Amino acid sequence: TLRALSLSGISFDSSYNASQFGADSGVMTGLTVVEPIECEGVHEYPMTVFDDGSGSLRHAQLTACSYGELESLLWKALETDRSAFVILSHNFELLNEAKNRPDEVVVKRFRKLCSFLDRNRDSFRVRPFHGLQARTALQQQPTPLRSPIWRTGARILEQAYRRRYG
């Protein structure tokens, strides 16, 4: 995929998901990529993943994480000097499963996240890839961020509520 992007003149990508591909992806054999790298002429900004306290990796996604998880992980990324925090998002995520009305739980989560980022502009810079200057690629990768198991439990309860009433 990265080679095809490079041949097409696309120099940035964010499709690498360590919670799915991990160390066997072929991007950096034997390493779980969590920080931007250069591979096949493309600067890969991997989706942010974290250990959810159960030993499993989970990707940062508006519908897959609670607001509390996202806020906490953003602060941890800042504290540990991570160069990027990439959140997976799909255009349909603000809709319910039937895709016929807004999913109020996710809409509220999105608004809270936007408000948090707006209040903390001095700490977090939100930007697209357009005009981004690639950093020197890391050949060593830090361990994924970690979220406590109680946040995972809170997310599971929130997701159960969302599926039942969302």
Name these PLM-found stretches.
Residues 1-80:
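Active-site-adjacent pocket scaffolds in enzyme catalytic domains
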Residues 12, 64-166:
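C-terminal domain-boundary segment and adjacent tail
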